[in-house]
C-alpha cells in the first residue's frame, strides 16, 4: 500500500516495552459527567442514512412549517457538505493545509457503535478512504482531487450569511428542521439554551510522584452534529471551549494532532493522527478523566501526548532546537525492545522488515 509508506517517512516510531494486557483496539467505557455511550477503539459501525436537518431543502420545509403565513423566503447556502477521495498523502495534506476538517465517515448516517475510524467498503484496503467535510460555498476545489458535493446546507451561526434571514428565530428554525426530519432525539430540552461546549480532559497517572490528575495538553477536540462541526484545542491544563454553539447533542472526538507540532498516529489502519471517539454528550460539553484501568488505549495516547508536549515546551523555553515539524509518534505495545525505533525524515522502508515488527499493522 503505497500511501502507507509515504506517510511513514516523516514519522518517529515509539515502540512501547509495556507488558500490560490489552490491545490498541480494545473496547473500554469512558467516564464523564453525563451518561455517555460505551465506545470502541476500532471500526465505526454505521446504520441507516439519516435526513440531514441542515440541508437547504429541509430548512426550507422547516421555515414553511414555522411561518406558514409568511411569503416565500430564500434559504441561503452557507456550506457545502462534500466528500473527497485523495489518491495519496500529498493530496490529503493539501486539503488539510487548506483548513479542510475531514472525517473518515459520513456525517449523515446513524452510528450504531462509535469508534476511532471507518473505511468505506467501496474503497480497496490500503487506500485512503472517502473523507467527509464541510466547506464554504466559495471554496476552490483543488485540481486533480476527486470530490463530490453531497448537499447544499444552511447551518445557523452568528455570521453574515445566516443573518440575511432577518428577524426569523434561527434557534426555533433549527429545532423545527430536526423535528421534521425525525431527528428530534438529537435535541437538548427546549429549556436548555444553546451552549458553547466546554470541559476538561485529564488523566490520572500513577507513575507521577504525586499520582495527581493532570490535563491532556494541546490536543484537538472535534464536535459535530450532522454537518455542524467545530474544532478547538485544549490548553496546558486540559481545558477546552468551542466557539460554536450547539442546541443538539454533539459527538465528541479527541484528535491527537497537537497544536505544538506533532501527532500520534496509529489505529488499526494508519491515519495522519489517531482519533479517539468519546461518544455523544451534552451540548454544554464533556469532562473526561482517564486512567490505565478505565481506558488503556486512550490513556497511552494521552501519556505520550503529554510527554511530547512537555518536551516541545522545554525546548522552546531553553532555546533547544525543537524536533522537525509534522513529527509523528506511533504507540505499539507489541514490541519487546526497550529502545525506541527511530526513522529519519526521508527514510526508505522495507515492507518485509516493517512487517516483522508490526505484523498486521503493515498490511
Feature roles, as predicted:
Residues 53-60, 197, 203-227:
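Short, ordered, surface-exposed loop/turn motifs in non-cytosolic proteins
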Residues 232, 331-362:
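Catalytic zinc-binding patch centered on the HExxH motif and its immediate surroundings
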Residues 225-239:
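Short, acidic Ser/Thr/Gly-rich low-complexity loop/linker segments typical of extracellular
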Residues 21-159:
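Long, solvent-exposed N-terminal ectodomains/accessory regions
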